[in-house]
Amino acid sequence: LRAWAERFRPWSVWAPWRAEQHCDHVAANGLASDFVSATPERALVKMEYLVWGWADPDLAHHHGAKGIWGLMCGDEIQRRRQALACHRTQMSSVIDDAAEAFLIPPDLAALTDRPVEIFLECRR
């Protein structure tokens, strides 16, 4: 990752929101945080996106963002729907023997129909 960053010199690193409830999202955020911390010579910005975090009723009080960015993506709605549909284990009852199923509720899935995606800029 470091060699890639030295070659492409990104201004930012993007990861799922640090308070997401799924271990793979938390791990991805941890990797991004470690990378930003390990490159103090560059002023990298960590941007976080919400997946399950939208279901958090107290999101506005504890998201911890330095800034909130919106990216217009109305022309990508169909692709976003298709991408969400690829997550079969979260969109249907494919997994029926888990103690805690994690099906995406319809109101959360409907967020892919928004013409804007929201990103949280992390505090350093």
Residues covered by each model-derived region:
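Metal-dependent de-N-acetylase/amidase catalytic core
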Residues: L1-R124
